[in-house]
Amino acid sequence: MDFDFKVSGDFIVSGAEQLDDTDLTRSDEFWLIQAPLGQFPEIEENTLKIEPDKDGLFGEFKDSNAGSLHLCLGAKYDLASFHSQDAGAELIIPSEESMIVGKITRRVALVRYPEPNELLQKMKARTQQKLVGSVTNSSKKSSNLTQSSRHKSGTRSSREKSMFSGFTETPKSPKRKNSESSSGKHRSSTSTVSGSSERSAKSKKKVKKEE
């Protein structure tokens, strides 16, 4: 069966020099050294003074790398190894014929205690990052508050307008009915007045004839 294997993005190919299998023997001791990514120190010393039988801190050296921003020139490193953390793994050199050259006998950690100036610089950088983050968060909150207040004021004004229009507007049909009824009343009153005047004129005529 064919398997399609894809390397993840976190995988980094080491550019260090490969081991030469001609100089390796079964009696050589290999260490698995752990250090932060991009902060591996440079060791110019040909020999290291160590106490191989000691558990814990068993040696030290000075870093000669002046180009790294995270490390100080001449910084002191301690070599730490604990028997409970021994790797117990085989070291294999990749080649045409993969060959086992030895066992990883120690898991070594590089321990360095930073200088006070380094700690102050790190604290300043962290405080600046926090201040920038707080400023951006406050600006976002203020913009959100202004937008919400504008939305609320717009809804309130529209509601007030609708309520005001509801109070001011009166139905037109009752006015028309009232005007029509009032005009009818005026017409009836005028007709009664005219009728009464005609009757009075007739009565006057009758009186004259009788005389």
Curated annotation (Swiss-Prot):
Region span, Disordered: 128-211
Superkingdom of this protein's organism: Eukaryota
A GO term from the CC aspect: nucleolus
Keywords: Nucleus, Phosphoprotein
Location relative to the cell: Nucleus
Chief localization: nucleus
Assembly and binders: Associated with the Mediator complex.
PANTHER family registered for this protein in UniProt: MEDIATOR-ASSOCIATED PROTEIN 2
Positions where Phosphoserine occurs in the chain: 173
Compositional bias per record (Low complexity), positions renumbered to this chain: 134-148, 189-198
Start-end of Basic residues biased regions: 202-211
Protein name: Mediator-associated protein 2
InterPro entries on file: MED2_plant
